[in-house]
Amino acid sequence: MNKSNHRSPFAIVGRLIVLVKPMLPVMLAAIVMGVAGHFCATFITIFGGFGILRALGLASPVRTVGTAFACILVFALLRGVLRYAEQASNHYIAFKLLALIRDKVFGALRRLTPAKLEGRDRGDLISLITADIEALEVFYAHTISPICIACICVVGMTGFVGSWHILPALVLLAGYLLVGVALPVWSAKRGDRAAREYRQALADTNSYVLESLRGLKDTLQYQDTAARAEGITAHSETLGEKQKFLKYREGLTVALTNTLILLTVLAVLGTSLSLYQSGKLGAEGVLVCTLSALSSFGPVVALANLGVGLTQVFASADRVLDLLEEEPVTADVTDGTDTAFAGAAAEHVSFAYAEEEILHDLSLTIPEKKIVGITGRSGSGKSTFLRLLMRFWDVSGGSIRFGEQDIRRVNTAAL
């Protein structure tokens, strides 16, 4: 597979998000239900605070404790329904788009075959078609709408807390930005290389295992099972080390997220108490601002958790885009000649897989209506020569003729 220069995350997002356009109404519905659901979850705690204020005889927006608990019950029921609807909408979009991407990938493979499937990276292709495309589900189901939901919820909760006093609102906004923007960006930058290495290690392991299965007969015949087993173990250990580092990064991100949330809540509480002591904020304001900080980080935490996950998404998307943009080894000829078979000839043909030369200065004539046997040791290039006759690849040197016509000027359909 052609190696890209590693597209920037913005370039990858631009390519992936274009596919969402036909599903825009469903995406908007998911965003609306997500925002409503998170506000319901947040105000369950806040209305509990309103109930406590009323029970203590302090100023409260609710008239009775019973009203507060009735609102809590309604919010709890709505939260469940809205959460289910949001997730159903997001995954509907994701699975529809993954099916579309798979269709594009198989279309690219049809365009690149047969040379692509005759290469030595079939395990890499299997990894791309399965694991890499499946990884894009994180982007479509857990990235686009959560980012929109978090932005709306941050604005809404900052405004709500700001209605009591601007200082706790600014402290809370700073906490939102640290958890939802600074932390995931830092995590993604630190884990970008590791994610790419993990995806490549997974593809290499798949290729090695598939190669081992395909050559099982030869492995048994030449009693090479111990070496193959050691190779599989080595690939597995390498993959495990890559995954271990990613899990460490993920755990560190979660720990930092929880720490920042706790510090933000304490900062909001401290700011509110300071305002209370100076008479600029009532006791009810201290309670509501603190409860708002405690209960409103849900949408922002979803963004913080994306940091490590998105690095793998971008690594997988980069590999998928590499395949979609890859050019065929030999382009189909449609403006050549439809030459009937009148014998074939190879003249000083050379060919190499990457840097490994298989054929060197081979000349051979295949007469019309004759049977020609090609013999040689295993790996000497017999099958390769037959595929060159079918123009899976172009020769590195020399030429192949059908009759008097160079094979590169014969229409592909006629071959």
Q: What annotation goes with each model-predicted range?
A:
Residues 1-41, 61-67, 86, 90, ...:
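Membrane-integrated ABC transporters
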Residues 18-25, 111-117, 131-140, 144, ...:
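An intracellular "coupling" helix at the cytosolic face of ABC transporter transmembrane type-1 domains
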Residues 22, 26-39, 142-197, 270-281:
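Transmembrane helices of ABC transporter permease
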Residues 27-82, 162-167, 283:
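Transmembrane helix-loop-helix hairpins at lipid-water interfaces of multipass membrane proteins
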Residues 54-70, 160-175, 249-318, 323-324:
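Helix-loop-helix
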Residues 88-107, 148-149, 172-217, 224, ...:
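Cytoplasmic coupling helices
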Residues 293-355, 394-396, 401, 410:
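ABC transporter TMD-NBD coupling linker
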Residues 339-415:
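ABC-type nucleotide-binding domain
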